[in-house]
């Protein structure tokens, strides 16, 4: 798939912007604070209905405007699909093929993107929350069911934590409601973890040969989904639900004492190993960056396998963070396969056939020229 055109209205520093794109590498050159990253973010928000930079949607709306609008036309195997996202201070509304989607979980997935920005290099060495968010965002764009289950899990988790806090402060003494909420929570916790386990297995399958190639065959990358549950090699949903029920039963007194849920996918993590050693703790910066790059490139094939089409790749100021060898490997991997958007302050020193054949745009003060 690829984006054929993009229109921004009152988005960040863009009053109005209309762009046409080719199904190739599109390089956006400009100094810092001119609008390069805002443009990349707009494509990502159009796809994911949320920003990778902020959780405050009001920041996406141009100063003194009531709403921002992002429109695009995506070309897929089965035809052309117009999509639109309107961001107001009251919320977001998305349209696919001119039809308004009742829920954003139904909207997400109309266009698939992979964002690789400098902060993604923290995927390995950052906090577990960073990796959980990575899982949720990437699984969500290929599985609307996952987004639905995750949303319900988070809603019930919030209700359960609120009730535990009431039990802790003795504003409530009857634990019947806790039993009801726990039963509901275990079902959706198990569904979320099952999908995450499946995704991590698939990601490892695609990331291993990429990592091996970058490391010239010297390193083997393995991934492990870390959860408080005992997970068998072939997990079963009903067994996982039972396991959660047993876990919450054992933790009940401690949870009431602390006023918070102490188990579930909101506390899980993904661990990365190179040649059997934990990369986060023992890996060099080079190994950590190779791991992050391998994971991002693996997503290209994983999404293609899931939906039958390649996603759109967004490389936001990330080339400058990679050495020449990793730059070359990245550009070689995407060559001729995926529509790619690259932002950079300069292409000087980046000598690769992919960039030489790219469409070049220049941005200054929120205005683009080619």
Swiss-Prot record:
The keyword Nuclease belongs to this UniProt entry's keyword annotation: no
Chief localisation class: cytoplasm
Pfam families: SMC_N
Domain of life, per lineage: Bacteria
Protein's cellular compartments: Cytoplasm
Record bears the keyword ATP-binding: yes
GO molecular function, one term: single-stranded DNA binding
A Gene Ontology term for the protein's cellular component: cytoplasm
Binding site for ATP: 30-37
Keywords: ATP-binding, Cytoplasm, DNA damage, DNA repair, DNA replication, DNA-binding, Nucleotide-binding, SOS response
GO biological process, one term: DNA synthesis involved in DNA repair
Matching PANTHER family: DNA REPLICATION AND REPAIR PROTEIN RECF (PTHR32182:SF0)
Sequence similarity: Belongs to the RecF family.
HAMAP family: RecF
Record function comment: The RecF protein is involved in DNA metabolism; it is required for DNA replication and normal SOS inducibility. RecF binds preferentially to single-stranded, linear DNA. It also seems to bind ATP.
Protein's name in the database: DNA replication and repair protein RecF
Taxonomic placement: Bacteria, Bacillati, Bacillota, Bacilli, Bacillales
Encoding gene, per UniProt annotation: recF
